[in-house]
Each structure stands twice: as C-alpha cells, then as structure tokens.
Amino acid sequence: MQRSSGINNLHIPTSPMSFSSNGINLPGSMVLDGSPSMQHLPQQQQRQLLEQQAGQGSVPMRENSYSHVDKKLRLEVKQEDLLQQQILQQLIQRQDPTGRNPQMQALLQQQRVRQHQQMLQSMSPSQRLQLQKQQQLRQQLQQQGTQQISPNVRPYEVGVCARKLMMYLYHLQQRPAENCITYWRKFVAEYFSPRAKQRLCLSQYESVGHHALGMFPQAAPDMWQCDLCGTKSGKGFEATFDVLARLIEIKFASGIIDELLYLDHPRENRFPNGLMMLEYRKAVQETVHEQFRVVREGHLRIIFSPDLKILSWEFCARRHEELLLRRLIAPQVNQLLQVAQKCQSTISESGSQGVSQQDIQSNSNMVLGAGRQLAKFMELQSLNDLGYPKRYIRTLQISEVVKSMKDLMNFTGEHKVGPLEGLKQLLEQTATVKLQRQKMQEMEQFGNSGAMSGPAQAQMTLSSGTMSGSTANNNSNNHHQIVGRGAMNGSPQATAALTNYQSMLIRQNAMNNQNSNTGNQEGFSSQNPTLNSNQSPSSSSQQRENLATSGFPSSPQMQQQQHILNGTPNMLPQNHPHQLQSPHSHGNTQEQQMLHQLLQEMTENGASVEQQQAFPGQSGSNNNTERNTTASTSNISGGGRVPSRINSFKASSNNNLPFSEDISVTDHDFSEDGFFNNSDIYGGL
C-alpha cells in the first residue's frame, strides 16, 4: 500500500487554482530525453565518444555477402554523417525541446534523404523492390491507423490514469482555506465529465440504519444496484455531475479537515471505445477530523473518458473504523481513575464503622460525572452509523430527490405549466407511452409465434399428404380437433397460427392453379375431372381446414353456411356411382360432422369479430368459404371426388375444377398486403 500524497515524481503546478492537464506527460507532449552523461561532458569528449560508438556500430557491407534476400539490410554509414546527425539532434533538443524549429527540422530532413539515397545505391535491384513494398505497406498501415483513431483520442500510455488520479488528489488537498464553491466548480469541471456519476455502495455493511437507503427505502432495491459487489440491496447513493461541487463543499464544511487515499497496485484497462478503467481491489479512504479520524476500506473503480476526465467513480465500502486521539481521551480516563481511587480510600478509612451515606453519595456523583465526561468525548455527534457526516448524507438524499424530479422540472419548464398541472400531464403521457409500448411488444410476440407456427404446420400438411388413406384420414380428424380447440379457446397464439396456415393454403392453391385453363371454369356440371390414382383422401380434410380457418365469418354468415351444409343439393353429376362405395366415405362423413360441430361452437362463442377486423378482404373470403363448402359436401351427396391440393402439384395441368376462380378472387384480396406476398415466410412454397 502506498499513500496517495506521495507524488514527488509528478510535475505538479504550484498554484492550486491552476487547473491544467499539462503536468501529465502524455505521449503527445513527451520529448526525447538526451543522455544525461552526454550533456555534462565537454564537446571534445562527446565527439570522441560518438566516434567510438560510430566505429563500433558501422559494419562494412558487400553485395556478395547476401545469401538471402529476407535478411536485414546492413548499411555502410560514414562516421561524419552519423556524427552530424547526432549533433543535429542534440541541437534540436537544446534549442527547441518541443521540436518546432523549422531550420533544424529541414537540416534533419536533408540528412535523412541523403542516407536513404546512399542506402538505395548500395542495394541490389531485388532488395530495392522489396524495400519499396515494405515502405508502401507501412504507409498503408499508418493511414489505416490514423483513420481508425479519432483526433480527440490521445494515444494510450500505461500509467496515465494513475497520474491523473494523483493530480486529482493533489488539488483536492491543496484547496483554499475559505472553502469557496467557485473553486470546487472549477475543480469538478477540470476532472469530471459532464456525464459523470459518483456512486457509494454500502451493501456489505451488516447493520445499517434506514438512512442508508435514501429517501425511497421501498423502491431503492429495484432502482439501485452495485456493479462491484453485484448485490441489489439498494443500500447506496448516487450523485451526478450537477451536485458534485456542492457535495464536496458540504463535505469539507462538515468538520473534515483532510481526505487521504491509500491505494494498492492498480489494474488498468483500455476499452476499444477509448474509455480507460482504473480499478483498485483494496483502497483505504481516511477522512481527518479535528478530534478523530475515520478509516474506510473498500473497492474502488474509476472510469476515464478518452480526454482523461472521470466518467464514473464507484466505491464499494466494506467496513470502517473510528479512531480517537489519545491526547483527548487520556485526561478523562485519568480523572475517572482518580475518582475510583478516592472511593477506594474512603472505604478503607471508614474501617468497621462503615461508609456514611453522605460519602457514598458524593463518591457516586464523582464517578458518574467522570464517566459522562468521558462518554461525551467519545461520542461523535457529527457522524452517523456509517462514519459519514450527517449533513453529507442528507445532501445525498436531497440530490436523489432532485434527480427523480428532474423530468418534471424540465416538463414544466418546456410547457409553461405549474407543478401540479405538469405532474398530472406527465403521468398521463407516461401511462400512454407505457401502454403503447406494451401493445407493440404484444404484437411482436404474436408475429413471432405466428411466423414460427406457419412453416411448421405447412411441413405437417405436406408430410400428411404422402401417407396412406386410412392413416391420413385419422390424422386429418385429429388435426381438425386441435384446430377446433384452438379456435374455441380464442388465444392470440392460436389465432395467429391459424391465420398463417390459411394464408399458406391460399398461396398453395394459387401456385397449383396459375397454369390452368380459365375458359373451363363454368361449373361442376360441365366437367368430368380425371382423378389421379395417387390422390390421398386427406385432400378433403385440407379443404375443410381452409374453411375452418378462412376469416371466421360473422354469425349470420355462419348460419348461411350451416344451411348450405345441411341442405345443399348435389352439384356434381353422378357419373361415377362407384365412388359412393369408397372405403373412405365413412371417414369423410366424420370429417363433415366435425366441421359442422366446429362451426356451431364458433357461432356460439362469437369469436369472429376480432378476425373480421384483422382481415380487410372479408367478403371475398366468405364467398369463397361458401363455394368451398358446396364443393366439399358434393363428395358425400353427389359422388365426385375432389382432387387433393398436395397431389395437384403433379397433375396441375389436368385440374379443371372451379377452385382456381375462387382462389383468384381470394388471392386478389390478400395481394394488397405485403405480408402475404413474402415468399420467405413460407419457405419458398
């Protein structure tokens, strides 16, 4: 541990008011230091020493001595040139330490050019080419480095943050005697960033009073958390840049004479954004009062901005000790000891007669008086249980109140209203913004769940079409039950999933029938569809899924559809009576009953209102639903089997059913929305 006041090696300004960062030797302001032994020697000895160094460093060079091109180049430099260059550098350092003399710079540049020419003459052509490539690569890297580094960001040097902290502590100690607020405002402006925050954590204290929780003890655990110890107890304070000057002024006005900081070896890091962090695992802060001292141990972390200003000051206190001066307590202890000795002598002198009541009373009063006086000296009235001045903690609490009301103050100032009216309007505005944010989050969640369930259901539909007849029939019945339960429950996730599934089926129909002949779309009575032997009975179930999920029409429309389901005459010619004896007719009857039950339950629940608002093209979808219902019931009453949508990928040219007309109308209704035109949602179907 080293004491922070030991900063003899720093270039500290003499005046406390001269706030300047020039005392820190940054890389931009550093100069080349000449050798101290060279500066004190006479010129003749310097010349001889330089000649000896030049003789030792110069190695004769021959072209035939190169065995590889990649070896480092050894140059034949004349002793006169080397001596002249070193003399020029010494002259530059002596006359102009900052290196701003143009004449000396020109001479040095000429010397470098001449050396470069000599080096090129002594090289072979291959070596010259390699040197040119290296120079070009070096220039490119330098240009990239200058582009990446901001002009305001200084080059990083190890220890620069620690030196800045030493400067901070020096000016903190060398304050004026009058403790004026003007000095502290300049102090804060010099060492703190306008976005700076100073945090004090007291979470590791075992027993602290309610004053450690600030003005809002119930809300403090949810609003305040320490990043050093990781606890969220709410025991701590935070001060912003606006109140730092007043806070420091009150600290030294509350009886603190000096503030010392004992620091361990720091851990210094630099982040890619230019911020620098200085962390001390063990830091001891000592506040000196007139009659006592408070020693506090904790964890300190300071974050500096790229311009070396404090952006964050965090101190997590572990424990503290209150040290009293011995010279102040010793007289009171001696007085108490004398009173005790007097009582002992009184008892011994009384002998067998005993001590009189008057002597006992007088001795008791003397003991009590000495004890009270000692307790008075040991009692620290200006401090609280945390070892901080009470006025200082009270100021921190007030600053938190001001910070919480800052939004209200700005709102009343901008809108020119009073405090009560401003508070009312601000609460209404905050509630509106919060409600809108919740709605946006719900919409995003529904969209994500719908986008995830749409492709999954599409994959299930495509895989179910390749199964056998009986298996497909059972799967379609189970799928109808699942869809019916989801629609009856009315959950937003189920609604979004059904909507995406419906749009996927519409898109499949549009792709299957886009090449079909539109002139043959007059009705079922004039057509004789050719059935594919590979068609699955699950096609009717998929059509009924489209009916169950297409738009959720209103109650009168549902009743009309139920009437169509119950009493629609056969619209298909009975050209294939043998199809009525199909083994899958029983499964289709069960599907028809399930669909009828589903429509009744949806009518009773009245879940169609929200879906009518969600789909603008509702009338077209209702008409299409009615047509699809008529077509699906014809398989039971009339006998013509409807081709499967999945198998129509293989026989799209032979599919002359009137579904293309219905789908074209629906596709026109939904084509205005970009959501249904995005092929990426459905995996390129």
Swiss-Prot record:
Gene Ontology CC entries for this record: nucleus
Residue positions of motif Nuclear localization signal: 185-199
Pfam families listed in its UniProt record: LIM_bind
Gene knockout outcome: No visible phenotype under normal growth conditions.
Region entry Dimerization, spans: 176-423
UniProt main location, coarse: nucleus
Polar residues composition bias: residue spans: 447-459, 512-524, 544-588, 611-636, 645-658
GO biological process, one term: cell differentiation
Biased composition (Low complexity): 39-56, 460-471, 525-543
Leader peptide range in chain numbering: none
Compartments (UniProt record): Nucleus
Keywords assigned by UniProt, alphabetized: Developmental protein, Differentiation, Flowering, Nucleus, Transcription, Transcription regulation
Annotated spans, Disordered: 25-66, 108-129, 447-491, 512-591, 611-658
PANTHER family associated with the record: LIM DOMAIN-BINDING PROTEIN
UniProt function note: Probable transcription regulator that functions in the development of the carpel margin meristem similarly to SEUSS (SEU). In association with SEU, supports organ development from meristematic regions by facilitating auxin response and thus organ initiation, and by sustaining meristematic potential through the maintenance of PHABULOSA expression.
Similarity annotation: Belongs to the adn1/SEU family.
The protein, known as: Probable transcriptional regulator SLK3
